């Protein structure tokens, strides 16, 4: 059982993108849900609007399935939850699983959330801080606050590390022979 990374209240994952060390890759995946109320599905979960949400409609566990076309490196999962707005619909226990498909998913994180308000940053790294490579991520809501039945999740973002490009990173020319060719006339 782990506790998610503590971030300042309202720490927007877009701040991660501004560091140019990660980029959001949710649009490259196929998203599916175990259930949803009409008008409260994947579109609301991915619309960048914190006022909209996915609402499940069925028995627990409630599942969000995220499938990539190729094996993908994932570093961080960000979930927006708001206990003040959602009360008993707010998740209190979440499991994050990864694998090649539905049949070989393995749990890599289980989170206990206590009245969350804002972005929850979940590292998807191994013990050596190395990002996970996977075809599929599954987020399972195992329990809600106040023993609520259905759940609300307002947003989910998935981030991959940005690989440094070698373009523009040439060794310094220090010898006389190299310095002769360092500029174009």
From Swiss-Prot:
<comment type="subunit">
    <text>The mammalian APC/C is composed at least of 14 distinct subunits ANAPC1, ANAPC2, CDC27/APC3, ANAPC4, ANAPC5, CDC16/APC6, ANAPC7, CDC23/APC8, ANAPC10, ANAPC11, CDC26/APC12, ANAPC13, ANAPC15 and ANAPC16 that assemble into a complex of at least 19 chains with a combined molecular mass of around 1.2 MDa; APC/C interacts with FZR1 and FBXO5. The C-terminus of APC10 binds to CDC27/APC3. Interacts with PIWIL1; interaction only takes place when PIWIL1 binds piRNA. Interacts with FBXO43; the interaction is direct.</text>
</comment>
<dbReference type="GO" id="GO:0070936">
    <property type="term" value="P:protein K48-linked ubiquitination"/>
</dbReference>
<dbReference type="InterPro" id="IPR008979">
    <property type="entry name" value="Galactose-bd-like_sf"/>
</dbReference>
<dbReference type="Pfam" id="PF03256">
    <property type="entry name" value="ANAPC10"/>
</dbReference>
<keyword id="KW-0131">Cell cycle</keyword>
<dbReference type="GO" id="GO:0051301">
    <property type="term" value="P:cell division"/>
</dbReference>
<keyword id="KW-0007">Acetylation</keyword>
<comment type="function">
    <text>Component of the anaphase promoting complex/cyclosome (APC/C), a cell cycle-regulated E3 ubiquitin ligase that controls progression through mitosis and the G1 phase of the cell cycle. The APC/C complex acts by mediating ubiquitination and subsequent degradation of target proteins: it mainly mediates the formation of 'Lys-11'-linked polyubiquitin chains and, to a lower extent, the formation of 'Lys-48'- and 'Lys-63'-linked polyubiquitin chains. The APC/C complex catalyzes assembly of branched 'Lys-11'-/'Lys-48'-linked branched ubiquitin chains on target proteins.</text>
</comment>
<dbReference type="GO" id="GO:0141198">
    <property type="term" value="P:protein branched polyubiquitination"/>
</dbReference>
<comment type="similarity">
    <text>Belongs to the APC10 family.</text>
</comment>
<dbReference type="GO" id="GO:0005680">
    <property type="term" value="C:anaphase-promoting complex"/>
</dbReference>
<protein>
    <recommendedName>
        <fullName>Anaphase-promoting complex subunit 10</fullName>
    </recommendedName>
</protein>
<dbReference type="GO" id="GO:0070979">
    <property type="term" value="P:protein K11-linked ubiquitination"/>
</dbReference>
<keyword id="KW-0833">Ubl conjugation pathway</keyword>
<feature type="domain" description="DOC">
    <location>
        <begin position="2"/>
        <end position="185"/>
    </location>
</feature>
<keyword id="KW-0498">Mitosis</keyword>
<comment type="pathway">
    <text>Protein modification; protein ubiquitination.</text>
</comment>
<feature type="modified residue" description="N6-acetyllysine">
    <location>
        <position position="169"/>
    </location>
</feature>
<dbReference type="GO" id="GO:0005737">
    <property type="term" value="C:cytoplasm"/>
</dbReference>
<dbReference type="GO" id="GO:0031145">
    <property type="term" value="P:anaphase-promoting complex-dependent catabolic process"/>
</dbReference>
<feature type="modified residue" description="N-acetylthreonine">
    <location>
        <position position="2"/>
    </location>
</feature>
<dbReference type="InterPro" id="IPR004939">
    <property type="entry name" value="APC_su10/DOC_dom"/>
</dbReference>
<keyword id="KW-0132">Cell division</keyword>
<dbReference type="InterPro" id="IPR016901">
    <property type="entry name" value="APC10/Doc1"/>
</dbReference>
């Amino acid at each position: 059982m782990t506790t998610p990374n503590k971030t300042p209240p309202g720490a927007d994952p877009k701040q991660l993108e501004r560091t140019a060390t990660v980029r959001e890759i949710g649009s490259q995946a196929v998203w599916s849900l175990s259930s949803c109320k009409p008008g409260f599905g994947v579109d609301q979960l991915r619309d960048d609007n914190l006022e909209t949400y996915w609402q499940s409609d069925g028995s627990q566990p409630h599942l969000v399935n995220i499938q990539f076309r190729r094996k993908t490196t994932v570093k961080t999962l960000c979930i927006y939850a708001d206990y003040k707005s959602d009360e008993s619909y707010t998740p209190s226990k979440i499991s994050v699983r990864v694998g090649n498909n539905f049949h070989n998913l393995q749990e890599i994180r289980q989170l206990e959330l206590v009245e969350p308000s804002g972005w929850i940053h979940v590292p998807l790294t191994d013990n050596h801080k190395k990002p996970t490579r996977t075809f599929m991520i599954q987020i399972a809501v195992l329990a809600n606050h106040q023993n609520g039945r259905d759940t609300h999740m307002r947003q989910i973002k998935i981030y991959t590390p940005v690989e440094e490009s070698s373009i523009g990173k040439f060794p310094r020319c220090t010898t006389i022979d190299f310095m002769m060719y360092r500029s174009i006339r």
